Amino acid sequence: MSKKPVVLMVLDGYGLSDKTEGNAIAMADTPVMDKLMKEYPFVKGNASGSYVGLPDGQMGNSEVGHMNIGAGRIIYQDLTRITKAIADGDFFKNEELLAAMENCKKNNSDLHLFGLLSSGGVHSHISHVYGLLEMAKKNGVSNVYVHAFLDGRDTPPASGKDFVAQLEEKMAEIGVGKVASLAGRYYAMDRDNNWDRVEQAYRSLTTGEGKQAESAVAAMEASYAENVTDEFVVPTVITENGKPLSVVKENDSVIFFNFRPDRAREMTRAFCDDKFTGFERTYIPTTFVCFKDYDETIPNKLIAFKKEEIKNTFGEFLAANGKKQLRLAETEKYAHVTFFFNGGVEDPNVDEFRLLVNSPKDVPTYDLKPEMSAPEVGMDLVEAIKSDKYDVIVINFANPDMVGHTGVIPAAVKAVEKVDELVGKAVQAVKDVDGVLFICADHGNAEKMIDYETGLSLIHISEPTRLGMIS
């Protein structure tokens, strides 16, 4: 008789490192994981580079990790695909990108390039912006404006100024483009329906509201002088003679060059959904091109790179064999155990049930609440294990990754300790019902919260992860 349920637990950002300095996992009191590692079989795994369909040396991330786990095989990622398209020239023949260019020429209008200005490779890559600038130049589009969203999570926290300088140098070399606005990803790339943040970025893009600066580099320097690093840069409009260089207007074209959907959906909906309700605004008709389809329910957009279908995912296999499955996470990682785990498919499989726990909204950053909503997730997990309703449960604990990204090591230690406590409760519940628990991670983060050469590090890393089985 087979054991039931089988629980696949993803400890997000919980990697392996031999070093203890800056290692929140090693610094934490983790009696449960320590005991499990001694008494049950665990193996070391890789969650970066070519092991997960990324370029060699490229760090992994939550999306990539969950997509590979859910597929049960290597899935070649959008970063690799788009970079290759630029290299072999197919990028410059892309019909949707060309449509944006043609619209600008037809209406003598502006081309706006939105996205995360970063070499992190998690949501975007700066080389893709260069490709768009080259394409605009080749197609005779002269009014090109980059609205740069600043990173500081997948790159060092104060690297944005350098990326802006690199971009402006490349613009001068190609002969087209200006930086028209800046905004930290905290505002421009929210994914948890914090519409007040998104609205601030949206207003800077469409009406020129927000801070003002005469140059993008000067704006970054001013932000750093106020101890506000990249992720939290307040939406800032670059001006000339006291007026914004450019804002998005009717008949303009927009290309959103992020390839990862979860943090591009809200801003895209604000621009494209003519029935938008997130905040008050007037719909602006544009030719709006997304690198990927961030959300099938968002209308009035073009998709530059169509989804490559991933067949026979773990969820599909379970459904085909009549198994009931539950996906459980808090909202910060809900898309990862559903959309990404299912190979980029939004709709659930047959007999796939989903349980969503709201992430905290009473704190601006999770170092102020390192437990996040893990206690509620853990309680729901134990109830689901004991319910006898599900054959398979896929569950994500977000804390090591989300709190690790804050760079506050004591908070990350508390996050790891809270997760350890909840793992213990899940282990006991699984044993009580004679089930099986697999523990793994999607990528590393909390085990290396400092750069051993430069100090603070908030970025994903290429450290190995682990997989264990408890039965």
Residue ranges and their predicted role:
Residues 8-10, 112-114, 255-256, 392-396, ...:
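Structural motif
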Residues 324-384:
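Metal-dependent catalytic core segments for phosphate chemistry
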Residues 459-471:
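Single conserved hydrophobic/aromatic residue that forms the stacking wall/gate
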Residues 95-96, 389-422:
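Active-site His/acidic residue clusters
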Residues 155-249, 255, 267, 272-284:
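Long, well-ordered, tryptophan-enriched scaffold segments
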Residues 412-455:
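Metal-dependent active-site segment of extracytoplasmic phospho-/sulfohydrolases and closely related
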Residues 236-323:
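Segments forming glycine/polar-rich beta-alpha architectures that bind adenosine-containing cofactors
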Residues 2-6, 15-186, 196, 200, ...:
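Active-site nucleophile/metal-coordination loop of metallo-enzymes that catalyze phosphate/sulfate
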